[in-house]
Amino acid sequence: MISCHSFTMTPSAPNSTVLPSATPVCPQSSACRWRGLIETYRPYLPVSDQTPVVTLLEGNTPLIPAPAIAKRIGKDVRVFVKYDGLNPTGSFKDRGMTMAISKAKEAGAKAVICASTGNTSAAAAAYARRAGLRAFVIIPDGYVALGKLGQALIYGAEVIAIDGNFDDALTTVRQLSEHYPVTLVNSVNPYRLEGQKTAAFEIVDVLGQAPDWLCIPVGNAGNITAYWMGFCQYKELGKGDRLPRMMGFQAAGSAPFIQGQPISHPETLATAIRIGNPANWDKAWAASRESNGEFHPVTDAEILEAYRILAAEEGVFCEPASAASVAGLLKQKDQVPAGATVVCVLTGNGLKDPDCAVQNSGNQVKAGLKPDLEIVAKAMGF
């Protein structure tokens, strides 16, 4: 029996109105102009008329059919990928950051801070600068993809690299936010999860129902927590009559949920989920337990294979950590019920880590050819 005991609807903020039905203000299927997550799902978020909405029109990302992956599973299974790499800064973090920064500005904050493996720093910097706030970012030195670091820098974040891992960085920013006038915007900030839960709303709005399985990469465990919050809230409002199994997948070298305890030295090429001590530990376990879900490990080799399949067979270019959801689905395909609908969450854009694509594509540039018709045609196989 699947239930939502640990996740209740967010109380309405003062001066906000809860609609009697679960119909969003501006559903994906409508022809109206997209206005960003807060305006679209305002009745279901802890905002009021006094909340200054800071938005880059995030959300409304596509739910893309994945027939090549479905064919590998068989059994008349339908597979979709929720491609959050098409958010403004290229990852799902924008969903949470529109809420976190809007509420920080409402509270009078002048600066925000986060620890990051890359995506959080990009989103925090973009939304903070749009709001006119300073953005401080603490990163683990040498463990952030250049595409993500470049984003944070060009947005104007004040970046500090520490000799340590993400967990060390998170401990540092938590301490700083307790002693200095900076607002913490990592996923321990509850407004982050409120924003991120809207991805579940969008999936139900498109499918008309929750999927049977929701496959998701797990790092700091905020996203699996947020999706479960969203599915539970929508069901309580009468939007659909079922809940998905939450299937969380971790890199084998960075898998505290599989080991059942935090780990000190996580290692994986999927840097976005290279986290040994997830901040949302208890909530993620609750989401898994209440949904009859599971956590499973996937190796770096399995992640890279799924990464290549998504690009070469589905035309979807995601960052390596995102592909953990598809790697996990393929690894657990014998468990998938016949006729099931499965959604795999792709958390970030492949352009976040172009070096990984170049190094692992299995493809090569045929360089040094003369601009001669016959020579080029021969290189093309004609």
Swiss-Prot record:
<dbReference type="InterPro" id="IPR026260">
    <property type="entry name" value="Thr_Synthase_bac/arc"/>
</dbReference>
<dbReference type="InterPro" id="IPR004450">
    <property type="entry name" value="Thr_synthase-like"/>
</dbReference>
<feature type="binding site">
    <location>
        <position position="119"/>
    </location>
    <ligand>
        <name>pyridoxal 5'-phosphate</name>
    </ligand>
</feature>
<dbReference type="InterPro" id="IPR036052">
    <property type="entry name" value="TrpB-like_PALP_sf"/>
</dbReference>
<keyword id="KW-0663">Pyridoxal phosphate</keyword>
<protein>
    <recommendedName>
        <fullName>Threonine synthase</fullName>
        <ecNumber>4.2.3.1</ecNumber>
    </recommendedName>
</protein>
<feature type="modified residue" description="N6-(pyridoxal phosphate)lysine">
    <location>
        <position position="93"/>
    </location>
</feature>
<dbReference type="GO" id="GO:0005737">
    <property type="term" value="C:cytoplasm"/>
</dbReference>
<feature type="binding site">
    <location>
        <position position="347"/>
    </location>
    <ligand>
        <name>pyridoxal 5'-phosphate</name>
    </ligand>
</feature>
<dbReference type="Pfam" id="PF00291">
    <property type="entry name" value="PALP"/>
</dbReference>
<dbReference type="InterPro" id="IPR000634">
    <property type="entry name" value="Ser/Thr_deHydtase_PyrdxlP-BS"/>
</dbReference>
<dbReference type="InterPro" id="IPR050147">
    <property type="entry name" value="Ser/Thr_Dehydratase"/>
</dbReference>
<comment type="similarity">
    <text>Belongs to the threonine synthase family.</text>
</comment>
<dbReference type="GO" id="GO:0019344">
    <property type="term" value="P:cysteine biosynthetic process"/>
</dbReference>
<dbReference type="GO" id="GO:0004795">
    <property type="term" value="F:threonine synthase activity"/>
</dbReference>
<keyword id="KW-0028">Amino-acid biosynthesis</keyword>
<keyword id="KW-0456">Lyase</keyword>
<dbReference type="InterPro" id="IPR001763">
    <property type="entry name" value="Rhodanese-like_dom"/>
</dbReference>
<comment type="function">
    <text>Catalyzes the gamma-elimination of phosphate from L-phosphohomoserine and the beta-addition of water to produce L-threonine.</text>
</comment>
<comment type="pathway">
    <text>Amino-acid biosynthesis; L-threonine biosynthesis; L-threonine from L-aspartate: step 5/5.</text>
</comment>
<keyword id="KW-0791">Threonine biosynthesis</keyword>
<dbReference type="GO" id="GO:0009088">
    <property type="term" value="P:threonine biosynthetic process"/>
</dbReference>
<dbReference type="GO" id="GO:0030170">
    <property type="term" value="F:pyridoxal phosphate binding"/>
</dbReference>
<dbReference type="InterPro" id="IPR001926">
    <property type="entry name" value="TrpB-like_PALP"/>
</dbReference>
<feature type="binding site">
    <location>
        <begin position="219"/>
        <end position="223"/>
    </location>
    <ligand>
        <name>pyridoxal 5'-phosphate</name>
    </ligand>
</feature>
